[in-house]
Amino acid sequence: MSVSFEAKETNRGVLTFTIGQDAIKPELDRVFNKVKKDINLPGFRKGHLPRAVFNQKFGEEALYQDVVNALLPAAYEAAVAEAGLEVVAQPKIDVVSMEKGQDWTITAEVVTKPEVKLGDYKNLAVSVEATKEVTDEEVDAKIEAARNNLAELVIKEGPAAEGDTVVIDFVGSIDGVEFDGGKGENFSLGLGSGQFIPGFEAQLVGHAAGEEVNVEVTFPEDYQAADLAGKQALFVTKIHEVKAKEVPALDDELAKDIDEEVETLDELKAKYRKELEASKEVAFDDAVESAALELAVENAEIVELPEEMIHEEVHRAINEFLGGMQQQGISPDMYFQITGTTREDLHKQYEADAEKRTKTNLVVEAVAKAEGFEATEEEINKEIEDLAATYNMEVAQVRSLLSPEMLKHDIAVKKAVEVITSTATVK
């Protein structure tokens, strides 16, 4: 294989390489043996057409496209490796020549990884809003949330207040004409919940069971039913019941109802404090990591970040997101229909974050290279075992899905993130 690379501009160039006859000839044989099975030619049994007759009738060149399609991926990868390039986007391939009996010449317009000039990335001083401290108020709020989950709705005498639940019948009309979806019976509505259009719930506050209330509202301009958007409506509303939330007493019995592993309220508070401390420590560490990486990127210089890298990251993120939706039974078409968005909208949404992630990845990879970080066999095996445990898969299955090079890269990058983060201090 002959390989050459000509730089055209920063991070771009043309890779020229050849595919030799030593690879072409056996592939020609394989392709011919495959296609001849489907050829019907008078005087010859199907699948038994001699090569010479095929060449005379169709020309050997008829096989070339299938041959080059089969050989090109591996030949391109080998050429990239031989030229010592780090290609970061899909190449534009052009077959320059496919002469019979000659080596074939291919060119690939490639985008290469930009140079990263590292600045300071160790011992960085960062500011974060997150804190590890857990206050009594936070513990109390967690208990209060659990307490409210055990609350019951009880019939209330007198007028409804914000936070109460009313059971209602309602009939909606516009200019005296009822409309589809504007009627309901024995509907439980939390006042202040925002379940109904703005202004509806507030007009029921102060009214008691047995009362009939004329609720006048205007549908929002962006209301999902276009025929109702922006229109004034009247809802004749009958209140059947008013219910108030009754929360259990704040005592040891409540603590046991919330968590069967504790006996007293003090034990529950101690347990909740420990849980909050653990979660806040994770959040604090994440905030420090994010701030340190951001500062390391700011301190570095990336020489002309190619747009193709950002687009590749956007497409990766979109495919990952839509793949997650599909696992929940929502196809891409269904998602776009439900949300009223397009793939282009998603592209714009992910673009800013994609640029930030791309820059961060480049800087972290440069740090890994500068520090000489590599992955040991033991670290690779542990990474595979951890992934298998995380995704509930067999170790052998994970090993078959991930290339050793990918694992080595990921481990080296983790070490780079660790050296940036662990040496950072919080101002």
UniProtKB/Swiss-Prot annotation:
GO CC annotation: cytoplasm
Main localization (coarse): cytoplasm
GO molecular function, one term: ribosome binding
Enzyme Commission number, as recorded: 5.2.1.8
Compartmental location: Cytoplasm
GO biological process, one term: chaperone-mediated protein folding
Pfam families: FKBP_C, Trigger_C, Trigger_N
Origin: domain of life: Bacteria
InterPro entries assigned: PPIase_dom_sf, PPIase_FKBP_dom, Trig_fac, Trigger_fac_C, Trigger_fac_C_sf, Trigger_fac_ribosome-bd_bac, Trigger_fac_ribosome-bd_sf, Trigger_fact/SurA_dom_sf
Primary enzyme class: isomerase
Keywords of the record: Cell cycle, Cell division, Chaperone, Cytoplasm, Isomerase, Rotamase
Domain PPIase FKBP-type: 163-248
Catalytic activity annotation: [protein]-peptidylproline (omega=180) = [protein]-peptidylproline (omega=0)
Protein function: Involved in protein export. Acts as a chaperone by maintaining the newly synthesized protein in an open conformation. Functions as a peptidyl-prolyl cis-trans isomerase.
UniProt free text on domains: Consists of 3 domains; the N-terminus binds the ribosome, the middle domain has PPIase activity, while the C-terminus has intrinsic chaperone activity on its own.
PANTHER family to which the protein is assigned, alphabetical: TRIGGER FACTOR CHAPERONE AND PEPTIDYL-PROLYL CIS/TRANS ISOMERASE (PTHR30560), TRIGGER FACTOR-LIKE PROTEIN TIG, CHLOROPLASTIC (PTHR30560:SF3)
Similarity field: Belongs to the FKBP-type PPIase family. Tig subfamily.
Name of the molecule in the record: Trigger factor
Gene name of this polypeptide: tig
